[in-house]
Structures are given as structure tokens and as C-alpha cells.
Amino acid sequence: MQENKMGTMPIDKLIISMSLPIMISMLVQALYNIVDSIFVSRINEYALRAVSLAFPIQSLMIAVAVGTAVGINAFLSRTLGEKDFEKANIIARNGIFIAIASYIGFAVIGALISRPFFSSQTEVMEVREYGVTYLTICCVAGMGIFLQTTFERLLQATGKTIYTMITQSTGAIINIILDPILIFGYFGMPRMGIAGAAVATVFGQIVAASMALWFNLKFNKELDISMKGFHPNGHLIGQIYKVGAPSIVVQAIGSLMTYGMNLILAAFGSAQTVFGIYFKLQSFVFMPVFGLNNGMVPIIAYNYGAEHKDRVIRTIKHSVAYGVGIMCVGLIVMHIFPAQLMRMFDAEESLIAIGVPALETISLSFVFAGFCIVVGSVFQALGNGVYSMIVSVARQMCVLLPVAKLLSLSGEVTLIWWAFPIAELASLLLSTYFLVRIYKKIICHIGEPVTTREITE
């Protein structure tokens, strides 16, 4: 049985076997994000800026999809560790129901608020029109992202991460192939411009979701996801969101931060475009760490449910080391090749002049971020996702945006980028405090009788 692997395989080998396929697939996705923006930049800078300004809503969609899936994954892995397989099936079905409901909500939102959303961020009419076209398509036809994420987490929860790699990579590769064809009208296709970029995105997501569903039906024998006779279970949905909601808030706060930064940077013209380019580039660094987390969460959750304290502790230590190591590589690359990275997006010298100090300064926060990202997922795996939420709110809303706004008053855009390292340092301190707290309250008591835990706490 797959659960035995998560309870017995050597930790290093287990983390790699669980995480590497997801990391590879997320790297492919990150490559898609970069390639997609490179193709869009060939239309003009206004189109690239529009895609950058659309990011907060797209990020919010991903926040709801991934955050819900995090709750499903952690709850499901813990239930499988407890050997309650019937309950695991019910959890999986309720997760699928939530994914469909989430899509319907965003389809309505995309149809109604796209124009006022862009009007609030820019006065440039060309940027607005590009943005409305792009975002409306991504929202109204965005069911794929919700179902893809849910079906992939069902595979991850039972240790079948290789199929997740296949689905994510296939979806991203389809995106990459279709982007130039639909944007520029190759091979007899109509020239769709920025609408082509949106269509390529949603089509790739739908294909990936379909593949993930097929893999679950064909190979995921631990779970029965048939919806025949299904009725929503409010209690289980509540348990999913007990872990998932803080994760949603954590990522949604990121969307709000991006929107706030776009408003702050609006006074500096092309700085909005630079900020968008940075986010595309940083995804290539952050995505492998997120992939590491996706492999780590079910390992910790399973061994927590199975009361294997030593394996929980070693998984945390090794994951932190891997996460920080990955971020150090990203820091080095952005300090050695900042101008070359900007030129990939057809950037003119004026844009490069803003972009180089931005990449060099913001990337200083990467090392701290590696620790904080991994530790945040540890909180979620142990059913304490609220700690991740507190850290995220404090970092982005209480530190980053206020500091960025304060520094913007100087009129020097290069100073604004320092808000990121400052905020990440605050996040490091708070994350460390919560990690010590959760170790004393939960981790060190794993395997003890319940009465002993209660007395200690």
C-alpha cells in the first residue's frame, strides 16, 4: 500500500520521490509563465502591462483553488494515515464539489468586474482594453484550474506525484505551443493577439484537468471519487477549510499586495511593467519550493496521523534545507544576470534601468523566503494553517505595503523595492516564533497518550 511508503521509506529519498515530480512540473509551469509573457511582450509593452495588472485576479483564482486543495490534501493524508478509507472517499468527493462551486463564483466575478478592476489601476486606454479581454476569458473559461488542482492533490495525497508531474507539464507545454500560434496567427489560425494568450491558458488547464481526472479513475485505487448519489457534507467541508481557508487567505493577501503595489507604482509609469516581469521571473525560483512543499505536506500529515514523531521532525529539517538552498540559487542568478533577464521581455534600455535594481534588491529577500515558505506549509500539514495566515498578513499588509508607500514618497522608485527584504525579515522572525510554539505544543508530544498531551498543554 502507498501509505506504507510514507511511513517507512528513508526521509531524504521519500521527500525527493514525492517532491521532485511536482517540482519538475512546476518548473515547466514557471517556464510557461515566462514564455507566455515573452510572447505577449512581442505585441507591445501595453499588452505586457495588461497581463501584469491582471495578475492579482488570476492569483486570487489560484489562491482559492490551491488553498482549498491544500485543505483537501492535508485532511485526506491524515485520514489515510489513520486508515479511515471510507471517510477519505467522502472528503475527496466534497473537494470536487467545492472546486466546481469556486469556478462558478469566479466566472461571475470575471464577467462583472474586469473593466472597473483595470480602470482602477491605469488611465491608459490601450492597457485597459487588453486587460479586460484577457481577464474575462481567463475567468469565464477558468474551470480547468480548479478541477486540475483538486484532482492533482488527490493523486498527491496517496503518493502518486508522478501523475501530477505529467498533468501539470502537459498543460504547460500545450500553453507554450499554443501561445505563438494563437497570438500571432500561425498555421492558418486567426491572429487573436492577447485573447490568444488567454485561450491558450484556459485550454491547457482544461486538458490538464481532464488528464488528472483520468489518472484518478485509472490508477488511484485508494480513493473512490464517483459523485453518484453525492450530497455535500457541511462538517467535512468545514474541516477542509479549517486548514484550507488560512492558505487561501495567505495567497489572497498576495493578490491584494500585488494590487496595492500596482497602485503605488502607477505614479512611476513603466515600474508596473517591471513589477510584472519580476513576478514572472520569481515564479521560476519559487515554484520548485512550492513543489517541495506539495510533496512535504502529505509526508508530515501522514506521519503525524501515524504518530511517527521522528519522521515528522526530520522531514521538516530536510525540507527547510532544500527550500533555502533553492532560493539561494535564485538569488545568485538574479544578481549575476539581471539585465539579460530583462531583455528576454523585449525591454528597452529605459525599462532595464528600472528593472536591474529591482531584481537585485527584491531577490535579497529570497533566502528568508525559502525558510518561511516551507515552515508555513508545516503549519498547514499539522492543522494549524492560521499561523501561516498571520505571518502572511503581517508581512504583506502590515509591513510590505506600508513601507513601500512610505518609500514611494521619496519619488525614487529604486527605494520602493527595499520594502520586500524588510518585509521578509519580519516574516522570518514571526515564522520562527510560531515554529517554536508549534513544536512545543504539538510536535514534541506526537506519540504520547492524549491525556499526557492535555496535561502538558
Model-predicted segments: where are they?
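Helix-terminus/linker motif at the lipid-water interface of multi-pass membrane proteins
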Residues: 27, 31-49, 118-125, 181-192, ...
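Transmembrane helical elements of multi-pass membrane transporters/channels
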Residues: 17-36, 137, 148, 171, ...
